[in-house]
Each structure stands twice: as structure tokens, then as C-alpha cells.
UniProtKB/Swiss-Prot annotation:
The gene is lpxB. Its EC number is 2.4.1.182. This is Lipid-A-disaccharide synthase. It is an enzyme of class 2 (transferase). The keyword Lipid biosynthesis applies. One of its GO terms (cellular component) is membrane. It comes from Hydrogenovibrio crunogenus (strain DSM 25203 / XCL-2). The keyword Ribonucleoprotein does not apply.
Length: 376
């Protein structure tokens, strides 16, 4: 098994436990994080070696990543495992899966790449690299069927995490907020590029909302210290006299405590929907990135709740529409329009129910079937 980041470590850890029920003496090796290791996984290299984000960062680390992949392939060809499971990290794993498959080692990829959003033609190559793909969304299987790739929808792990998150009352207690205080959560993203493009806009939006709702407080989870400092700088410039609560990570706590959210796109939009919090999506990209995305994108929407609904239930303010005035007006409408909130919440409940599957058990069943595993 090779997991590429923290989310993959969680998926891998759960899958190991489910496979151990079926094969108590199985050995699990490759690259994994602390959760996988805690469940008996033997990690040959630290997970952090693969946790590289952003084009520049990947290019900087490319020689060492290619060297690592070459070493891994050699080790695995020597070992000849009964099955190889690549967890996410598509740019790293698919090439490796293809070589292992050519050498008669069954290969399975867990978390299908977002071919439904862009570059669907990747599946022409992927069909030669894997014996099956485990996907997180029900609509994804149709894409794999089209290219003759076995796939199985196993549900989304966020449903389990959300089930363990605090309710609004306990979240507010933790933050020292009363139950009748109006609270808006602001999620500016996890990458520095997202934060730099959006945080000044968001703080100015908060200033406008504060004029209309003087009692309103704003909760902002910050992914790391650098993000926290950038947010604090923005507040000192545009948000003086307004009550902001900055958290160290704790995005789910921020969501749980909030009445509504402003979210930069990504997994956070789905997380907010699964936590049943009304939201709007706002995002600005670098002009070149936006141009490329517009040319390659095959979906009408950016936010996962809209993709899952097949219609626009969450307002999306993108690029030139992501202005202070437009975001503030849209959020004000979300606060005051009960029907708009109800439409979102009804759809979010359906999405939670659809994605709330026993993912690791379903994944283990598919692995056994596709890799033709037997208890000797």
C-alpha cells in the first residue's frame, strides 16, 4: 500500500483493519502514516516524503520523488505482493500500478482522480494500469464503466469524521460563544495561494456584515501559523473593532459553531454540507490557473454539493464575481432567506445519507474480488 497524504493514511488504516478480519496473518507494507502504522503497517519510508503540494513544490522535489518511486517498484517486484493498493496520490501511484500490473501483480487504486471534473481522457491510460478503482462518489462509476474499468462506490470517509464532530451547542461552549450570538464561519482554504487571494476580501465582507449585524462574530480556522499571521494582518488592515476568533486548524469546530459559512472551494464545501451548515462558495484563482481550469473543466459547478445535487443549491461566486459587495449581498440573502437555507439543508441531508456507507468493508470486499485473494 502507498498512501500520499494524511487523508490517505486514514483510509489506509481503516482498510487494513477490514482486510485483517478476512486475512488475520496478512502483512501490510509500503508507505503509510501513523494511523496505518498503529494498525500493524510496515512503512518503508515516511509518508511526508510524498505529501508535496503545488506545482513548484512538486518540481522542486521531483528528482527525489522519482528516485523513491523507482526504489519502491524494485522492492515490490522482488516481494511480489498478492495485491498493491495505491491510495490517492495519482501522479505517484498510477505509473507504479501500471508497472506492477505488467508484472502480474494485481493493482487497485483507492480514491479515483476527479475525471468527472477535468481530463476524463486520463481513463484511457488508467484502464491499462489498474484492476479496479474504489471511488468516493456514486456518480463516478459511470465514467469508469465507459472505459471498461472495474469500479466500486464505497462512500466518503468524511461522513464518519463529521459524525464525530461536536454539535453547535458544545462547539459554542468550547469557544465561549452564547447560543443566541449570530456566528459566521470563514474558511479561507488551506493553501497559501488561496489564503492570499481571498482573506482580504473575506475580512472586508465581515466588516460589511458587521454593519448590518453588529452582534455577529466571525470564526476563522487557520491551517498553520503562517496562515494565522496572514489572517491577523488582514484583520489589522480591514477588520478593526470586529470580533474575530482565530483557531489553530479545527475547521470542523468552526463549522459546528457557525450559523452559516463562506467557503473557498475544495473538500471544505462537502464537509460543510455533510455538517448541515448553509454556505456560499467564493474563490479567486491566478488568472492563468483560471484560464486553464475553464478550458479543461467538464462540470458546470466548482462546489461538490452542487456537483452531487446536479444543480446549483450553493451560490458560487468565482473570479470577477468574488467581490466584497457580491459576497456580502449573497451571504445576507442566505441569512435572511429561510427557503434558500431549507433547500440547501434538505439536499445536504440526502447527500450525507448517500455518502454514508461502510467504506472500509465495501473496499475490502472489492479488493478480495478483484485481486482474487484466498485464505491459504
Amino acid at each position: 500500500m502507498v498512501a500520499g497524504e494524511a487523508s490517505g493514511d486514514t483510509l489506509g488504516a481503516d482498510l487494513i483493519l477490514s482486510l485483517k478480519k478476512r486475512f488475520p496473518n496478512a502483512r501490510f507494507v509500503g508507505i503509510g502514516g501513523q494511523k496505518m502504522i498503529a494498525n500493524g503497517f510496515e512503512s518503508w519510508y515516511p509518508l511526508e516524503k510524498l505529501s508535496v503540494m503545488g506545482l513548484f513544490e512538486v518540481l522542486k522535489h521531483l528528482p527525489s520523488l522519482l528516485r523513491l518511486r523507482k526504489e519502491l517498484i524494485q522492492k515490490l517486484l522482488q516481494l511480489k505482493p498478492d495485491v498493491f493498493i495505491g491510495i490517492d496520490a495519482p501522479d505517484f501511484n498510477f505509473k507504479m500500478e501500471g508497472i506492477l500490473k505488467e508484472n502480474a501483480i494485481p493493482t487497485i487504486h483507492y480514491v479515483g482522480p476527479s475525471v468527472w471534473a477535468w481530463r476524463e481522457k486520463r481513463l484511457l491510460k488508467i484502464c491499462k494500469q489498474v484492476d479496479g478503482v474504489l471511488v468516493l462518489f456514486p456518480f463516478e462509476t459511470a465514467y469508469y464503466d465507459k472505459y471498461g474499468i472495474p469500479s466500486k462506490f464505497v462512500g466518503h470517509p468524511l461522513t464518519n469524521q463529521v459524525a464525530d464532530s461536536p454539535d453547535k451547542h458544545s462547539a459554542r461552549q468550547q469557544l465561549g460563544l452564547s447560543s443566541d450570538t449570530p456566528v459566521t464561519g470563514i474558511l479561507p482554504g488551506s493553501r497559501s495561494s488561496e489564503i492570499n487571494l481571498m482573506i482580504d476580501v473575506y475580512v472586508q465582507v465581515a466588516t460589511k456584515l458587521h454593519e448590518a449585524y453588529p452582534q455577529m462574530k466571525f470564526v476563522i480556522p487557520c491551517v498553520n501559523q503562517a496562515a494565522k499571521e496572514r489572517v491577523a494582518l488582514s484583520i489589522s488592515l480591514y477588520g478593526k473593532g470586529i470580533d474575530f476568533i482565530l483557531l489553530d486548524q479545527q475547521a470542523q469546530l468552526a463549522m459546528a459553531a457557525s450559523d452559516q459559512l463562506i467557503v473557498t472551494s475544495g473538500t471544505a464545501t462537502l464537509e460543510a454540507a455533510l455538517m448541515q451548515r448553509p454556505l456560499i462558495l467564493a474563490i479567486k484563482l491566478h488568472p492563468i490557473s483560471y484560464w486553464i481550469m475553464k478550458r479543461l473543466a467538464t462540470t458546470k459547478w466548482v462546489g461538490l454539493p452542487n456537483v452531487l445535487a446536479g444543480k446549483c443549491i450553493v451560490p458560487e461566486l468565482i473570479q470577477e464575481n468574488a467581490t466584497v459587495d457580491k459576497i456580502a449581498q449573497t451571504l445576507d440573502k442566505l441569512i435572511t432567506d429561510k427557503e434558500m437555507r431549507e433547500v440547501q439543508l434538505t439536499e445536504f441531508k440526502k447527500q450525507y445519507d448517500a455518502l454514508n456507507q461502510n467504506a472500509s468493508e465495501l473496499a475490502a470486499d472489492a479488493v478480495v474480488k478483484w485481486a482474487k485473494l484466498k485464505n491459504d
